[in-house]
């Protein structure tokens, strides 16, 4: 990943965090890493953990096309690891935030 892509990713995550806070979410963790992958944002709302993938672009393709079954499987393994590491077992869901040209689309409880 180049420097520009890295900085764009941080900018996208910052925008997503501001959006989530306005929606009443508590941000618990950013960029949680495991040997299986990474979760961009872990947040909580109404006692439900939200594991949120952020996709950010300024190009002319659909951002949601960059999330496939393989990536979702990595996210699920990372969620399992997060639960084990923190000794918790709570309700959770996987969400997707797509940011394209400063427009935020929030897709809740995604699956394949």
UniProtKB/Swiss-Prot annotation:
Sample GO molecular function, one term: nucleic acid binding
InterPro entries in alphabetical order: Restrct_endonuc-II-like (IPR011335), tRNA_endonuc-like_dom_sf (IPR011856), UPF0102_YraN-like (IPR003509)
A Pfam family reported for this protein in Swiss-Prot or TrEMBL: UPF0102
Domain of life: Bacteria
Gene3D superfamilies assigned to the protein according to its UniProt record, in alphabetical order: 3.40.1350.10
Family: Belongs to the UPF0102 family.
NCBIfam families (UniProt xref): PRK12497.2-4
PANTHER family according to UniProt: UPF0102 PROTEIN YRAN
Name of the featured protein: UPF0102 protein JJD26997_0163
């Amino acid at each position: 990943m180049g420097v520009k892509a890295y900085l764009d990713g941080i900018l996208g995550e910052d925008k997503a965090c501001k959006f989530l806070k306005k929606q009443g979410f508590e941000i618990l963790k950013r960029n949680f890493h495991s040997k299986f992958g990474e979760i961009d944002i872990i947040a909580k709302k109404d006692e439900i953990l939200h594991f949120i993938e952020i996709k950010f672009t300024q190009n002319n393709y659909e951002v949601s096309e960059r999330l496939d079954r393989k990536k979702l499987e990595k996210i699920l393994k990372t969620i399992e690891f997060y639960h084990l590491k923190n000794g918790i077992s709570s309700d959770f869901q996987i969400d997707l935030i797509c940011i394209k040209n400063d427009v935020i689309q929030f897709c809740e409880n995604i699956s394949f």
